[in-house]
Amino acid sequence: MKLLEPGTEIDGFSVLECIHSGGMAHIYRVEYAVGAPNPGFPLAMKIPRMTAGDGAENIVSFEVELQILPTLTGPHVPRFVAAGDLERLPYLVMEYCSGHTLQHWLDADERPDVATIARLGAAMGRAAHSLHQQNVCHLDLKPGNVLFTHDNHAVLLDFGLSCHAHYPDLLAEELRRAVGSPAWIAPEQVVGVRGDPRSDIFAIGVMLYELATGELPFGAPSTQGGLRQRLWMAPVPPRQYRPDLPEWLQETILRCLEPEAAKRHPSAAHLAFDLAHPDQVPITERGQRQHGLGLRTQFKRWIKAVG
């Protein structure tokens, strides 16, 4: 579908401008047409790409978001407004949230200080916990999908790869393969396990690692073999890149990135608490680590992962 021109009207909504044109959807600022009631907040319309060359994932992801977004409430998600008919013109209208995505801090010339990293991480943890309390796992948390408002709330965006505990998992049923963004996908997602809230904790850990070091802990692999390495490989300790980082922060980040979900924080609320109360973080070998794990330990992890 070609981009909509400003002034185009769709089901009582008037297009103002295109604010994002991505591989899976176009997003527009819109407003109610003349004579319609004012909702009291700005609006955005998301229209999935559905040209002949686009895969089934685009439309399935739209169906997933259409299924999940209307069920969500609270300050950490955009408010749902309306949806278009799937057969005629599929679209979602939701609250437009202003602020900066996490990418804003990653694009800065200097790495943020420890207090900023902890503040951003705690906000992400609280937002993820709110989502998990509503029986939803995001499963595609990454810098472009986390927005920070001017009052320092984290707002989670794009629920096209999400999973609701009480609804059919359309992506698992239709695609039957791991789906997610390669740099941030959790090890269990790589092997097809969806619906574990601790997968979102892993993704937050990847973002904290990149905030702290400017590096991705597992790179951005493009092959299944590259993705599977995170099932056993340990990332370079953040303090090796940045010695000024405190042990408690490295401890917290590396705990998020444990290949076994059971070894991560038990909930996103626990992660948020640790980031807000560094004096209460118990320091283990993870926090004191100066170098990557030895070959023997890596081999044991590999045996456990493949066995």
Which residues does each predicted region cover?
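Activation-segment/catalytic-loop signature of the eukaryotic protein kinase fold
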Residues: A83
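Conserved short submotifs of the Hanks-type protein kinase catalytic core
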Residues: E87-T101, W105
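C-terminal lobe helix-coil module of Hanks-type protein kinase domains
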Residues: A183-I283
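AlphaC helix of the eukaryotic protein kinase fold
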Residues: A52-T71
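Protein kinase catalytic-loop region centered on the HRD/HxD motif
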Residues: R126-V136
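Conserved beta3-strand ATP-binding lysine motif
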Residues: K46-R49
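Activation segment signature within eukaryotic-like protein kinase domains
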Residues: L120-G121
